[in-house]
Curated annotation (Swiss-Prot):
Domain annotation Ig-like C2-type: ranges: 20-119, 125-216, 225-305, 313-401, 407-500, 504-592, 596-685, 690-783, 787-883, 1285-1377
Gene that encodes the chain: Dscam
Tissue: Expressed in cortical and cerebellar neurons, in cells of the external and internal granular layer and of the Purkinje cell layer (at protein level). In the retina, expressed in dopaminergic and Nos1-positive amacrine cells and most retinal ganglion cells (at protein level). Expressed in the brain with highest levels in the cortex, olfactory bulb, hippocampus, thalamus, cerebellum and spinal cord. Expressed in the retinal ganglion layer (RGL).
Domain remarks: Ig-like C2-type domains 7 to 9 are sufficient for interaction with NTN1 and commissural axon outgrowth. The transmembrane domain is necessary for interaction with DCC.
Cellular localization per UniProt: Cell membrane; Cell projection, Axon; Synapse; Cell projection, Dendrite
Ranges per topology, Cytoplasmic: 1616-2013
Organism: Mus musculus
GO MF terms, alphabetically ordered: netrin receptor binding; protein tyrosine kinase binding
UniProt GO cellular component terms: axon; dendrite; growth cone; neuronal cell body; plasma membrane; synapse
Name of the protein this chain belongs to: Cell adhesion molecule DSCAM
Length: 2013
């Protein structure tokens, strides 16, 4: 068995062979420009490389590969390009100024470098220069190095020199990045030097030095800014530092402001303002834009405008970075570009540019995307993206690797033998990219469907194609060669194998074959069946092979015919198969051989335009018929070309009768027959002879400028243009032109001459050739026109002042030539004096001469000789220096010492001749210059000198002379200077010490002797120390300023009672003199600083305590110990304090005797000296020992039944210990039996049962302590009764309780039957049943409870018990303790930092004072501080206060109940006042030309330290103040840099804590020569109209002043009006702020059964009130200080329902809308002030000028007359209409004289009361018995100042004063009282306060009140509304007043009335409340408005809506 297998592979393209690790890369991708000097040449390495080694080539930008030019250009084998040095005549633009690139190629591909511009720089001469500059002293100067533009790009400034000395950038000299020289803070000496710049050529290395320039320095003069350095545009790359220069000259120093794109530029971070301008660090493209530098001062502005271009370096990035694909796939590349916009992007593959085509697409913005479809193997390699913009370029590359995608057979079927009917499955597994298509054949015939074969395929996960061929039942005919063919775009692969099916062998019929001559042909024998023996081939019965071209493969039956030949190989071929040895079969096939055409090659010869063309195409062989066609450039030839084609058999000819350029192209002849189609191609090039497009013409060239000689030609090939030159105008002899940097041929063929010279004049020939036809040429003549040029002139020349000077210059050029002379920027005219210009022609030259007669200093400078003709101009600069004697130097004092003066001078104008020396003169100020000391010929190199051996503190005058070779200068300005002081040589005199306190010593002394002071004594140093015999202690030094010849100082904060030694030294500016002799003194004695320590107390008996302590150290005693004081007091059980006692002793122990038994004592110990008591020790507590108790204070016994009695008792008055129990004894006499019963210590009654009826028993009680039984009580007798009468076991007595607590009054009654109990309260001597309500109730055991006890609950309560057999009664006196009364606070002493307050305590409220709270606040501040104070103290000193400041103080006492009323607010001021300048001191110590020394010693601090000091000055007539850099006040201050000979205004402001003071002054600086300037005088200039400018200005100023004055007056009136109102309300604000503080502190919990909170209490203090109180029968004027009491109450519905039973009544229907709390204080004790603001409701806002009215109700008692208490001060009789006055009680220290107006805050002159005054008056009223139950009506209104006099007089008629005047201050227009309600007539009188008494007759009333009372006695029913203003009227249209409407009383008032006799009871009739009169139609509104919860209820405003007949009233008691 044998196997036949054949594998063929076919490829459609040639590919590169890949190395396994090949790559390409760049070694210097940034190389883009190479510039070199022509004299040095350069080497340029190729920036590309690769692995394996690459082939490097260089190309021009046009793509032409460069070649070696011997001696000029060479490419080394390593790829380095070398340009050799060359002379200028060999310069070639093609080589020396061109763009190159190089390529690197290896098997990976080919990459191309970026374009590299190679440029040679020719050496050419150049000069740099610097121009003179001008500036002002103290300003900035800028020198610039001017470089010719032709070399500016290559030449840089490397340094600057100042008189041959190199300058280094430092503090004053700065060299910028652009090469400019900045000189900062220019001084006069800077003008003495020459300045030049040094440059270096970047490529040739040549250096150049500029000419010398001078700096002219002038004195500062007011001027607008002028730009010294700026910029037009700047270009930079991102990341670089950019400097934008902007510097200007101006005075004052201008301000710089930068803008970018017209927006202010924030100078921070990367943007920094420097001396030179703007510095931008790390520039960014966003920084590009327009920049404006605005420079301005008060005299003008200037601008620098320029643009900045910041370019981002171009960067190209290709993605993806790695591309590996397969043949036939698609590859996409993207090129991202960063950098500038609008760049040009192009793609390259293997160094060749890519253009869009069939399979290449370039898309995206700016062609950024490259897409290639159907990649073939040749598409692999290096891809590059190039980006170009201007001269910048960037590239990136990526290698694209294409894998072989040709199909490959992975696995396939093999040859096999099968039996018939056996199934067969053939598999072919193929891979390839793209996926291949698999087809099947059998013996070269395609297998079709339905032939018994099934074909299927699948794609595996690996991407392989698996094709199946299945035969379900094989047959013999299915045998043969099976072939699977895989085909894709990359290629095709075949696999075949034979499948033999057993059966008889045979041959399938074979098709005839056509073979192509010259190629190979295969013939297959298609055998089927198996097995067989052999296969043989025959041709014409001849067994094959019979030659070398025939090969027979017996194993597979294939015959191969190589290089088929028609004559030999064509014919019949037979295949014979031997089936069996004797059996064979055969089959024949005919082979036909076809011969393809063969075209004889042809080529187009060289044709020129217009010629005729004939080209034949001959097919020399090939089978006929043959078809011949022609194509041009791959397309059929169009008929429009005029081409004729003739075809004859096997030939074809192409004919063109008239050749033109359009016939250029590739022509192809194509021959076709049945065998094949062949073609031959040849290129036709039409050559065009040259001809001129632009012919040269004669033209003119101007010397020194560029000229272009035009010449342009065309032709094909492109013609070459060559220029030749013949010098001169003679017969032309043309010679080639040597091209160089000056002469170049442009790309269009024109000749460029950059700088025309005279030698360029002549004939120029333009020759054009291209080897086609004859060359053409044309000549032209260039005429060189010479512009005017200065050929000869002196650069510098000298002249002597006053002499004649001539200067000449020679000009050359085309005539006519005009020569003119200029001085600086001024043209010299013939009519100008002293100048004479003459001109003459000498040959081709013109000579001009300038004569100056005579020369003066102003002639120094630059003269220019300016020559002008029609072709140009030139200028020669001549520096004329006029020499003269120098100007005097400007001298100043460099240093002044006590013995030397160092001068420094600045040389002014040197006379343009070097200074040869200086002369210095010095004299005493008072001497003449004739006696001056002289120093001559000081070296000119010096600019300072020192004068020695002068006297300290003496005044000298100094001047100088300068000399040069011309002469001597005038004397300089005279400087007067005082030598520095030396330290004093003598001590202060008459030093005395005087101790002034325990911690201070007063030191007095006098200045040292005059001749020893060595200057002005500025101050003193006081040295002090604690004196000791050793004397080793170091002195403490205090420095003080001097105030005169006699000095005084007080040393503070010394140790008390200590011996001190003290010395004094005088000081001046030079130092400190010797000290005085040490003097010894001792500080005064003081109280001890510390309390005794280790205080111990031990109770030794029930009545004694032993106390011991440690004595004090000497340091703590502060004096001589006089003894110790022991203070002690008993702490009683009820919390009260016993009497405070003290005992003195000299020993450190003491025994206290006679103490209360078993009592807790507080003990303190202090030491005292002769100065007083020291600090008390901390309290210690010790209790005396127990003893037997005293007898019970009382015993009661009563029968409860026939066999039982009750015993009750009171505790002993002297408990003497803890009661352990009580023993009750009961005995009867017959027989005597004593029974003992024990009761617990907390029970006070005992029931004794089982007694005998009708038998008397004796009962007594004994208390028992741990010490034993005490004394027995009295023995009482009791008898048990069956009918036991009612008896009360409770004892009568006094019950004391704090207010706002629940109190239970016991009443335990016994009897049989059980008695009934009732409680009564005594009211004005008449008992009445107690009221049972929510607050009062009676328990079932008979006890009476009062919840939240109030002051009015005080009084006598009686409990009555009765039954059928008797009754009993007890009386309990209930005393309610209340907060204490206000203390009376005064100021006793003030200092600069402390205020000592003293006070007298008020009533303690029934409970001893526990302490005080002192509040204080700084004036105009609402922040209050507080201090707790001991109850025994009566004064307090506040330390560390501000000096010279007003303070407010209040004091509050506290007892066991709580804090009481605050005292009135008093004010005091610490010592001190605002600073002031002493009139005896001179402000200006010294004045010269530019400096002023101020003497600040004259400032007196006013006793308070200086806190701030401000000093400002400005030149007279200017508006801008200059603030001196000064923050503290010292002895002197110097103002620098002033303008000479100028008047100045000066103002100072000095402040301390007491205030500020200002001082203004004018001064004038001296002239340059030291003289004074005239005083200020207004100049007068007469105008044409006769009116002076000054007069016009006066009129304008006068009108302006009048207008401003009127405006200021109006504003002042508004301010005064506002301040008056603020001052009137200031006191109320003080009370408000204090109330706010107290409201936050005084919250406490009420001890009620329900644990309700107590209300907050607010005290409103009023210093004074004047009140008119009306009654029906009496009227009193009360004047005193009082406080109104306010507490809160709930005015909800519940309160309204209880209005008949409680003491507050609301007479306003909409009271719930009130804006503040409605307050019920009926339970308050007079003089206290609880309040809260809960349940406050908002209401309508009050309107101005509306009256508000409050009615205050309180029941009036009917009691007998009493006298007034001592707290009341009745006014003395006075005249009618007068007003009581009382001196203000505020304490004012002696330092307060200047603020005397502050001591009274409330006017006592006005009858109009403030709300505070009303509150005080009301309190006094309610404390008066006969007014306690009166109803008060308060009417509020707004009054004016004009109406106060009428109100004070108390007019009885209505006036218009209230309605017509301007509203001013809120006040009280009316205050009336109404009778009490009848049911309130019997209210409680037993208050726990002193009773108020009233006078019994009219004697004590003021006369006007008595008169008013008598006048109204007869009208009991008339409303008492005739007093004090009577009403507040709302201003309306009409002024007619109606009789006031009288409001009806409230329903409660009208429901009852009382009457009695005048002797026993006060008679009251029902009256009405006086209210506001109204006009018709007027709406008078009134509603309560509470401004805040802390303000008084009386400080309210409101309005009543509608015609409500009721006034709003509040019940306040």
């Amino acid at each position: 068995m044998w196997i036949l297998a054949l594998s063929l592979f076919q490829s459609f393209a040639n590919v590169f062979s890949e190395e396994p690790h090949s790559s390409l890369y760049f070694v210097n991708a940034s190389l883009q420009e190479v510039v070199f000097a022509s004299t040095s040449g350069t080497l340029v390495p190729c920036p590309a490389a690769g692995i394996p080694p690459v082939t490097l080539r260089w190309y021009l930008a046009t793509g032409e590969e460069i070649y070696d030019v011997p001696g000029i250009r060479h490419v080394h084998p390593n790829g380095t390009l070398q340009i050799f040095p060359f002379p200028p005549s060999s310069f070639s633009t093609l080589i020396h100024d061109n763009t190159y690139y190089c390529t690197a190629e290896n098997p990976s591909g080919k990459i191309r470098s970026q374009d590299v511009h190679i440029k040679a720089v020719l050496r050419e001469p150049y000069t740099v220069r610097v121009e003179d500059q001008k500036t002002m002293r103290g300003n900035v100067a800028v020198f610039k190095c001017i470089i010719p533009s032709s070399v500016e790009a290559y030449v840089t400034v490397v340094s600057w020199e100042k008189d041959t000395v190199s300058l280094v950038s430092g503090s004053r000299f700065l060299i910028t990045s652009t090469g400019a020289l900045y000189i900062k803070d220019v001084q006069n000496e800077d003008g003495l030097y020459n300045y030049r710049c040094i440059t270096r050529h970047r490529y040739t290395g040549e250096t150049r030095q500029s000419n010398s320039a001078r700096l002219f320095v002038s004195d500062p003069a007011n001027s607008a800014p002028s730009i010294l350095d700026g910029f037009d545009h700047r270009k930079a790359m991102a990341g670089q530092r950019v400097e934008l220069p902007c510097k200007a000259l101006g005075h004052p120093e201008p301000d710089y402001r930068w803008l970018k794109d017209n927006m202010p530029l924030e100078l921070s971070g990367r943007f920094q303002k420097t001396v030179t301008g703007l510095l931008i660090e790390n520039s960014r493209p966003s920084d590009s834009g327009s920049y404006v530098c605005e420079v301005s001062n008060r005299y003008g502005t200037a601008k620098v405008i320029g643009r900045l271009y910041v370019k981002q370096p171009l960067k190209a990035t290709i993605s993806p970075r790695k591309v590996k694909s397969s043949v036939g796939s698609q590859v996409s590349l993207s090129c991202s570009v960063t950098g500038n916009e609008d760049q040009e992007l192009s793609w390259y593959r293997n160094g060749e540019i890519l253009n869009p085509g069939k399979n290449v697409r370039i898309t995206g913005l700016n062609h950024a995307n490259l897409i290639m479809d159907h990649m073939v193997k040749s598409d692999g390699g290096a891809y590059q993206c190039f980006v170009r913009k201007d001269k910048l370029s960037a590239q990136d590359y990526v290698q694209v690797v294409l894998e072989d995608g040709t199909p490959k057979i992975i696995s396939a079927f093999s040859e096999k033998v099968v039996s018939p009917a056996e199934p067969v499955s053939l598999v072919c597994n193929v891979k390839g990219t793209p996926l291949p298509t698999v087809t099947w054949t059998l013996d070269d015939d395609p297998i079709l469907k339905g032939s018994g074969h099934r074909i299927s395929q699948m794609i595996t996960s690996e991407g392989n194609v698996v094709s199946y061929l299945n035969i379900s039942s094989s047959q013999v005919r299915d045998g043969g060669v099976y072939r699977c063919t895989a085909n894709n775009s990359a290629g095709v692969v075949l696999y075949q194998a034979r499948i033999n099916v057993r059966g008889p062998a045979s041959i399938r019929p074979m098709k005839n074959i056509t073979a192509i001559a010259g190629r190979d042909t295969y013939i297959h024998c298609r055998v089927i069946g198996y097995p067989y023996y052999s296969i043989k081939w025959y041709k014409n019965a001849n067994l094959l092979p019979f030659n070398h071209r025939q090969v027979a493969f017996e194993n597979n039956g294939t015959l191969k015919l190589s290089d088929v030949q028609k004559e030999v190989d064509e014919g019949e071929y037979t295949c014979n198969v031997l089936v069996q040895p004797q059996l064979s079969t055969s089959q024949s096939v005919h082979v036909t051989v076809k011969v393809p055409p063969f075209i004889q090659p042809f080529e187009f010869p060289r044709f020129s335009i217009g010629q005729r063309v004939f080209i034949p195409c001959v097919v020399v062989s090939g089978d006929l018929p043959i078809t011949i066609t022609w194509q041009k450039d791959g397309r059929p030839i169009p008929a429009s070309l005029g081409v004729t084609i003739d075809n004859i058999d096997f030939t074809s000819s192409l004919r063109i009768s008239n050749l033109s350029l359009m016939h250029n192209g590739n022509y192809t002849c194509i021959a076709r027959n049945e065998a094949a189609a062949v073609e031959h191609q040849s290129q036709l090039i039409v050559r065009v002879p040259p001809k001129f497009v632009v012919q040269p013409r004669d033209q003119d060239g101007i010397y020194g400028k560029a000229v272009i000689l035009n010449c342009s030609a065309e032709g094909y090939p492109v013609p070459t243009i060559v220029w030749k030159f013949s010098k001169g105008a003679g017969v032309p002899q043309f010679q080639p032109i040597a091209l160089n940097g000056r002469i170049q041929v442009l790309s269009n063929g024109s000749l460029l001459i950059k700088h025309v010279v005279e030698e360029d004049s002549g004939y120029y020939l333009c020759k054009v050739s291209n080897d086609v036809g004859a060359d053409v040429s044309k000549s032209m003549y260039l005429t060189v026109k010479i512009p005017a040029m200065i050929t000869s002139y002196p650069n510098t020349t000298l002249a002597t002042q006053g002499q004649r000077k001539e200067m000449s210059c020679t000009a050359h050029g085309e005539k006519p030539i005009i020569v003119r002379w200029e001085k600086e920027d001024r043209i010299i005219n013939p009519e100008m004096a002293r100048y004479l210009v003459s001109t003459k022609e000498v040959g081709e030259e013109v000579i001009s001469t300038l004569q100056i007669l005579p020369t003066v200093r102003e002639d120094s400078g630059f003269f220019s000789c300016h020559a002008i003709n029609s072709y140009g101009e030139d200028r020669g600069i001549i520096q004329l220096t006029v020499q003269e004697p120098p100007d005097p130097p400007e001298i100043e004092i460099k240093d002044v010492k006590a013995r030397t003066i160092t001068l420094r001078w600045t040389m002014g104008f040197d006379g343009n001749s070097p200074i040869t020396g200086y002369d210095i003169e010095c004299k005493n100020k008072s001497d003449s210059w004739d006696s001056a000391q002289r120093t001559k010929d000081v070296s000119p190199q010096l600019n300072s000198a020192t004068i020695i051996d002068i006297h300290p503190s003496s005044t000298y005058s100094i001047r100088m002379y300068a000399k040069n070779r011309i002469g001597k200068s005038e004397p300089s300005n005279e400087i007067t200077i005082t030598a520095d002081e030396a330290a004093p040589d003598g001590p202060p005199q008459e030093v005395h010490l005087e101790p002034t306190s325990s911690q201070s010593i007063r030191v007095t002394w006098k200045a040292p002797k005059k001749h020893l002071q060595n200057g002005i004594i500025r101050g003193y140093q006081i040295g002090y120390r604690e004196y000791s015999t050793g004397g080793n202690f170091q002195f403490n030094i205090i420095s003080i300023d001097t105030t005169g010849d006699s000095e005084v100082y007080t040393l503070d904060n010394l140790n008390k009672f200590t011996q001190y030694g003290l010395v004094v030294q005088a000081c001046n500016r030079a130092g400190t003199g010797p000290s005085s002799q040490e003097i010894i003194t001792t500080t005064l004695e003081d109280v001890p600083s510390y309390p005794p320590e280790n205080v111990q107390a031990i109770a030794t008996s029930p009545e004694s305590i032993s106390i011991s302590w440690s004595t004090l150290s000497k340091e703590a005693l502060n004096g001589i110990l006089q003894g110790f004081r022991v203070i002690y007091w008993a702490n009683l059980i009820d919390g009260e304090l016993g009497e405070i006692k003290n005992v003195t002793t000299t020993q450190p122990s003491l025994e206290l005797d006679g103490l209360e038994k078993y009592t807790n004592y507080s003990i303190q110990v202090l030491a005292f000296t002769r100065a007083g008591d020291g600090v008390r020790s901390e309290q210690i507590f010790t209790r005396t020992k127990e003893d037997v108790p005293g007898p019970p204070a009382g015993v009661k016994a009563a029968a409860a039944s026939a066999s039982m009695v009750f015993v009750s008792w009171l505790p002993p008055l002297k408990l003497n210990g803890i009661i352990r129990k009580y023993t009750v004894f009961c005995s009867h006499p017959y027989p005597t039996v004593i029974s003992e019963f024990e009761a617990s210590p907390d029970s006070f009654s005992y029931r004794i049962p089982n007694l005998s009826r009708n038998r008397q028993y004796s009962v007594w009680v004994v208390a028992v302590t741990s010490a034993g039984r005490g004394n027995s009580s009295e023995i009482i007798t009791v008898e048990p009764l069956a009918k036991a009468p009612a008896r009360i076991l409770t004892f009568s007595g006094t019950v004391t309780t704090p207010w706002m607590k629940d109190i239970v009054l016991p009443c335990k009654a016994v009897g049989d039957p059980s008695p009934a109990v009732k409680w009564m309260k005594d009211s004005n001597g008449t008992p009445s049943l107690v009221t049972i309500d929510g607050r009062r109730s009676i328990f079932s055991n008979g006890s009476f409870i009062i919840r939240t006890v109030k002051a009015e609950d005080s009084g006598y309560y009686s409990c009555v018990a009765n039954n059928n057999w008797g009754s009993d009664e007890i009386i309990l006196n209930l005393q309610v303790q209340v907060p204490p009364d206000q203390p009376r606070l005064t100021v006793s002493k003030t200092t600069s930092s402390s205020i000592t307050l003293s006070w007298l305590p008020g009533d303690n409220g029934g409970s001893s004072i526990r302490g005080y709270i002192l509040q204080y606040s700084e004036d105009n501040s609402e922040q209050w501080g507080s201090f707790p104070i001991s109850p025994s103290e009566r004064s307090y000193r506040l330390e560390n206060l501000k000096c010279g400041t007003w303070y407010k103080f209040t004091l509050t006492a506290q007892n066991g109940v709580g804090p009481g009323r605050i005292s009135e607010i008093i004010e005091a001021k610490t010592l001190g006042k605002e600073p002031q300048f002493s009139k005896e001191q001179e402000l200006f110590a010294s004045i010269n030309t530019t400096r002023v020394r101020l003497n600040l010693i004259g400032w007196n601090d006013g006793g308070c330290p200086i806190t701030s000091f401000t000093l400002e000055y400005r030149p007279f007539g200017t508006t801008v103040w200059t603030t001196a850099q000064r923050t503290s006040l010292s002895k002197s201050y110097i103002l620098y840099d002033l303008q000479e000979a100028t008047w100045y205004e000066l103002q100072m402001r000095v402040c301390n804590s007491a205030g500020c003071a200002e001082k203004q002054a004018n001064f004038a600086t001296l002239n340059y020569d030291g003289s004074t300037i005239p005083p200020l005088i207004k100049s007068v200039v007469q105008s044409e109209e006769g009116l002076t400018t000054n007069e016009g200005l006066k009129i304008l100023v006068t009108i302006s002043c009048i207008l401003v004055g009127v405006l200021l007056l109006f504003v002042l009136l508004l301010v005064v009006r506002r301040r008056r109102r603020e001052q009137r309300l200031k006191r109320l604000r003080d009370a408000k702020s204090l109330a706010e503080m107290l409201m936050s502190k005084n919250t406490r919990t009420s001890d009620t059964l329900s644990k309700q909170q107590q209300t907050l209490r607010m005290h409103i203090d009023i210093p004074r009130a004047q009140l008119l109180i009306e009654e029906r029968d009496t009227m009193e004027t009360i004047d005193d200080r009082s406080t109104v009491l306010l507490t809160d109450a709930d005015f909800g519905e519940a309160a309204k329902q209880k209005s008949l039973t409680v003491t507050h009544t609301v007479h306003y229907q909409s009271v719930s809308q009130a804006t503040g709390p409605l307050v019920d204080v009926s339970d308050a004790r007079p003089g206290t002030n609880p309040t809260t603001r809960r349940n406050a409701k908002a209401g309508p806002t009050a309107r101005n000028r509306y009256a508000s009215q409050w009615t205050l109700n309180r029941p009036h008692p009917t009691i007998s007359a009493h006298t007034l208490t001592t707290d009341w001060r009745l006014p003395t009789p006075r005249a009618t209409g007068s007003v009581d006055k009382e001196s203000d009680s505020y304490s004012v220290s002696p330092s307060q004289d200047t603020d005397r107006a502050r001591s009274s805050m409330v006017s006592t002159e006005s009858a109009s009361s403030t709300y505070e005054e009303l509150a005080r008056a009301y309190e006094h009223a309610k404390m008066e018995e006969q007014l306690r139950h009166a109803k008060f009506t308060i009417t509020e209104c707004f009054i004016s100042d004009t109406s106060s006099e009428q109100l004070t007089a108390g007019t009885n008629e209505y006036t218009d004063s209230l309605t017509s005047s301007t509203p001013s201050e809120s006040g009280i227009c009316r205050f009336t009282a109404s009778p009490p309600k009848p049911q309130d007539g019997g209210r409680v009188v037993n208050m726990a306060v002193p009773k108020a008494h009233r006078p019994g007759d009219l004697i004590h009333l003021p006369p006007y009140l008595r008169m008013d009372f008598l006048l109204n006695r007869g009208a009991p029913g008339t409303s008492r509304d005739l007093s004090l203003g009577q009403a507040c009227l709302e201003p309306q249209k009409s002024r007619t007043l109606k009789r006031p409407t009288v409001l009806e009383p409230t329903p409660m008032e009208a429901s009852s009335s009382t009457s009695s006799t005048r002797e026993g009871q006060q008679s009251w009739q029902q009256g009405a409340v006086a209210t506001l009169p109204q006009r018709e139609g007027a709406e008078l509104g009134q509603a309560a408005k509470m401004s805040s919860s802390q303000e008084s209820l009386l400080d309210s405003r409101g309005h009543l809506k509608g015609n409500n007949p009721y006034a709003k009233s509040y019940t306040l008691v």
